[in-house]
């Protein structure tokens, strides 16, 4: 549905040959969709890593990626995402500098690009196809980069490496909300980086990504760098902006600049919508309000200059940023586990919140006392249960303590899972300083030596940044033999439902979605 919606917008405006659409699903899924519905996809996305083990976390291998590169058809080829630090933070650094790992990713991307071009030549399609690499610098957090200077250094290093590899490399100059980089610092970073001429920058309606909870470049930043550094939009898109009426013949913004309602009106007219302009604009206003109510920012208009946000939106974004800082450092109150029916308090090896933030591995393993507590529960229950519920603070303890949304979500999950015939344990493991992998450790302890399909359903406080205090559900199903192997269960077999809060995706719908996903896992 998302692929189709994006394709429809580009086709309707007649720019599908100038700009590709892409959905950040696993490359296997994109290839399957293209096989079922040829022409539905454009660029194929995949995150890649610098070692076989780290790539395994993304459920890819070099051989698999080579096959996808050779099978990809059309003008638009492959879109890779990389970033320094992804390998060692997933436990696959092997004592090697993260800069070396990043360069290996670029080597892999170059090889895959070559395989794509050769396959196209053999089929008589010509050798040219779009291949992009997006360096998501700073995405992981302070365990990789602490401040703005380190972020700039990383971006410059990666631009040089990418260009030396002959890649079209662009940047997602991003920073998490638990790094010591502010909204305003991000503007400084952009000015330091742009003279190195990256191939492109990401863009959002503001500098906050509401889905992933991090900061990156906004659309208004693109206006700024055109003004300051003289960069240009490519000719096809600039002509389209003129045709759309947001840029005049002299290249200056018109009264429709920064107005998504005007774009929606133009879209409807191209769809032969016969309603009056006012009716369509009123509908656009309603739809924008609906999107904003879900925590997604849509910028309208601009500030005193066309390269700045409208003042009210800028103030709103700064308030969200400040609230996110509170969420990141907050901790679960004493006795919180007692407020969750069946709650059993356990904890990880993090010494304190600072240790947890700066050393994520400490929040991925349980402390000895917690393991002993789980082992006693295992003896008590034997093999009566096949599904365990886990609740962790993650990077947003306040998502757990805001109203009763965590309790409601747990209760809804229990109800949905039992309705599906799951044998759900009565306890809920409430983990302090718990990251997603801490849930896997619970499964390894409780399911050790068992047979059959066994599940962990783990509710985690999402890292903040949307303006909503949201929870995610991580759903992991594996056989007993897999759970019995240390660290065998990982993100590559886990599904997630995100953005759950009373003010976003409500707990009941979140629980129903998780149950439906689990049914599809076997």
What do the predicted segments below correspond to?
Residues 1, 139-145, 172-176, 386-400, ...:
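Short glycine-rich or small-residue beta-strand-to-loop segments that form or flank ligand, phosphate
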Residues 11-16, 28-192, 196-204, 210-214:
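Catalytic alpha/beta core domains of metabolic enzymes, predominantly
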Residues 13-26, 450-455:
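A glycine-rich helix N-cap at a beta->alpha junction
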Residues 100-102, 110, 118-125, 458-522:
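C-terminal functional extensions of proteins
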Residues 112, 374-417, 424-428, 435-445:
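Internal active-site segments that recognize and position negatively charged phosphoryl groups
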Residues 215-279:
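Extended, intrinsically disordered, low-complexity segments
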Residues 267-331:
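Extreme N-terminal leader/targeting regions
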Residues 302-381:
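N-terminal low-complexity, intrinsically disordered segments
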């Amino acid at each position: 549905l998302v692929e189709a919606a994006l394709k429809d917008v580009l086709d309707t405006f007649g720019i599908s040959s100038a700009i590709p659409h892409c959905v950040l699903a696993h490359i296997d899924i994109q290839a399957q969709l293209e096989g079922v519905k040829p022409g539905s996809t454009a660029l194929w996305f995949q995150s890649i890593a610098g070692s076989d083990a780290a790539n395994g976390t993304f459920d890819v291998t070099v051989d698999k990626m080579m096959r996808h590169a050779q099978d990809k058809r059309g003008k638009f080829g492959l879109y890779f995402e990389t970033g320094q630090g992804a390998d060692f933070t997933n436990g696959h650094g092997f004592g090697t500098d993260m800069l070396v790992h990043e360069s290996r990713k670029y080597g892999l991307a170059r090889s895959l690009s070559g395989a794509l071009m050769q396959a196209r030549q053999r089929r008589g399609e010509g050798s040219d196809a779009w291949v992009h690499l997006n360096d998501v610098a700073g995405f992981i957090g302070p365990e990789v980069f602490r401040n703005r200077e380190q972020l700039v250094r990383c971006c410059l290093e990666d631009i040089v490496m990418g260009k030396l590899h002959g890649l079209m490399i662009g940047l997602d100059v991003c920073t998490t909300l638990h790094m010591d980089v502010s909204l305003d610092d991000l503007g400084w970073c952009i000015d330091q980086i742009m003279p190195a001429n990256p191939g492109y920058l990401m863009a959002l309606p503001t500098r906050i990504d509401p889905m992933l909870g991090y900061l990156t470049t906004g659309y208004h930043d693109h206006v700024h760098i055109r003004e300051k550094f003289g960069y240009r939009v490519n000719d096809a898109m600039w002509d389209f902006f003129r045709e759309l009426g947001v840029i005049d013949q002299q290249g200056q913004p018109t009264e429709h600049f920064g107005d998504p309602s005007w774009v929606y009106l133009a879209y409807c007219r191209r769809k032969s919508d016969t309603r009056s302009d006012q009716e369509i604009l009123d509908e656009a206003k309603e739809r924008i309000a609906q999107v904003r109510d879900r925590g997604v920012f849509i910028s309208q208009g601009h500030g005193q200059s066309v390269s700045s946000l409208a003042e009210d939106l800028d103030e709103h974004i700064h308030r969200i940023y400040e609230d996110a800082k509170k969420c990141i450092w907050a901790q679960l109150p004493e006795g919180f586990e007692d407020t969750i029916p069946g709650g059993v308090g356990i904890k990880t090896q993090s010494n304190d919140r600072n240790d947890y933030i700066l050393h994520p591995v400490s929040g991925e393993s349980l402390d000895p006392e917690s393991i002993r507590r789980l082992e006693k529960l295992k003896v008590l229950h034997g093999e009566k249960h096949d599904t365990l519920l886990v609740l962790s603070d993650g990077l947003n303890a306040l998502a757990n303590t805001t109203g009763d949304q965590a309790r409601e979500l747990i209760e809804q999950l229990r109800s949905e899972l039992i309705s599906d015939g799951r044998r759900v344990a009565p306890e809920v493991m409430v983990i302090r300083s718990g990251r997603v992998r801490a849930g896997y450790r619970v499964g390894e302890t409780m399911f050790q030596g068992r047979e059959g399909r066994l599940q962990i359903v783990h509710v985690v406080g999402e890292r903040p940044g949307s303006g909503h205090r949201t929870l995610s559900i991580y759903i992991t199903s594996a056989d007993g033999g897999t759970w019995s192997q240390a660290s065998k269960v990982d993100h590559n077999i886990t599904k997630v439902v995100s953005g759950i809060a009373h003010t976003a995706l409500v707990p009941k719908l979140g629980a129903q979605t998780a149950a439906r996903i689990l049914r599809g896992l076997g």
